[in-house]
A protein has these predicted regions:
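An acidic/histidine-cluster motif and surrounding catalytic segment
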Residues: 2-225
Length: 225
């Protein structure tokens, strides 16, 4: 998780720069920049867990390559949409970060102080009659919130073993009496929920899909703007 959020911080600082900024095409550590946060200061939402998103007109992409925690493309679920260009994130071991135009499913998100103020205003003072995640997506697409997405997402919803209707309070009724033999965590290769017993017993964590190489202790990361 620390490795992943370090990558997210670098990507968010890159995307927070003005588009006309000539240094926005250069990846650097940014540790000399004046900021109150490792994630930068010019953002409202970092959407880390979702079930799909679309990019806004900003065509910049921060590409994270050689990430062993990225699921295979065949294992990724994104029913609500995916960003362009697909050829970037469909490369093995690759995630991309981008300025988001919309998103669905508020599984995990970070909010800046200013972003929290904007959310409170939008959802309590201004007219608001949507589900939270749909409303959050609308606030991103309208430009009220400055939002960054990562795809494939780092966090996913967990569907436990047992009755499939337990998966969601919204859509669980559609599952009827179907039984899920094994739990699953959407878009997470090494799921903490599925590995709780292994973690408690000091054993190696297991991927939730077959045919995945073991996770090395060290992640060798590469960044491409």
């Amino acid at each position: 998780m620390k490795y992943q959020l370090l990558d997210v911080a670098r990507g968010n600082r890159f995307l927070s720069r003005p588009r006309e900024d000539p240094t926005a095409t250069i990846i650097e550590d940014d540790t000399s920049s004046t900021t109150n946060s490792p994630y930068g200061s010019d953002w409202d939402i970092i959407w880390l867990g979702h079930c799909g998103s679309y990019s806004d007109p900003d065509t910049r992409r921060f590409v994270l390559k050689n990430d062993p925690t990225v699921p295979r493309v065949s294992d990724i679920m994104y029913p609500a949409g995916s960003p362009e260009p697909e050829e970037l994130w469909k490369q093995p071991g690759t995630r991309i970060m981008y300025k988001s135009g919309n998103g669905v499913c508020s599984w995990t998100y970070a909010v800046s102080f200013v972003g929290a103020q904007k959310l409170l205003n939008a959802m309590s003072i201004e007219p608001f009659n949507q589900g939270f995640d749909q409303g959050l997506g609308r606030l991103c697409s309208s430009g009220i919130l400055r939002c960054t997405h990562i795809f494939p997402p780092i966090f996913g919803a967990h569907a436990p073993a047992g009755g499939a209707n337990r998966e969601s309070d919204i859509t669980g009724h559609r599952a009827g009496t179907k039984i899920r033999e094994k739990g699953r965590t959407h878009n997470v290769l090494w799921s903490t929920r599925l590995n709780i017993k292994n973690i408690l017993e000091g054993k190696k964590v297991e991927a939730q899909w077959d045919g995945v190489p073991d996770l090395n202790d060290e992640m060798k990361r590469e960044f491409i703007p």
